[in-house]
């Protein structure tokens, strides 16, 4: 996520350091992943994290929401901080794509990894944003 700059990376680090992410699998916890960002407070990410690559991509996605809302609330008043539905997925998708491109570059000659990343780009990034939301 380095291309997004030091300020953005500080927000990501703050999320990890200050435990914004509830990743434990507990009884009664909702499945899937969700980021809640109340105005004037830190974001909260709810998800199950089993340390597989799918969960890493989901975490990158939810951190995109968290980073977006932290920056929006820092620079907008309470009435202007929430984006439209058409824009809300852009920062999280950007995070996903940056991680996917980073992994693809690191994969070298590992064709299996490159195929997996390409499938993620279609199955999760594209499908989630353009089929489930619109």
Predicted regions and their residues:
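Cation-handling catalytic/transport regions enriched in His/Asp/Glu
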Residues: 1-134
């Amino acid at each position: 996520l380095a291309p997004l700059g030091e300020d953005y990376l500080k927000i990501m680090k703050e999320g990890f350091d200050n435990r914004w992410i509830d990743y434990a699998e507990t009884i009664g916890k909702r499945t899937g992943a969700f980021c809640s960002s109340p105005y004037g407070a830190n974001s909260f990410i709810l998800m199950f994290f089993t340390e597989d690559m799918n969960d890493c991509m989901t975490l990158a996605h939810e951190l995109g929401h968290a980073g977006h809302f932290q920056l929006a609330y820092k620079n907008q008043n309470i009435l202007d901080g929430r984006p439209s539905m058409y824009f809300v997925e852009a920062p999280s998708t950007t995070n996903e794509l940056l991680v996917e491109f980073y992994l693809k570059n690191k994969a070298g000659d590992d064709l299996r990894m490159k195929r997996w990343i390409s499938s993620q780009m279609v199955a999760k990034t594209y499908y989630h944003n353009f089929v489930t939301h619109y």
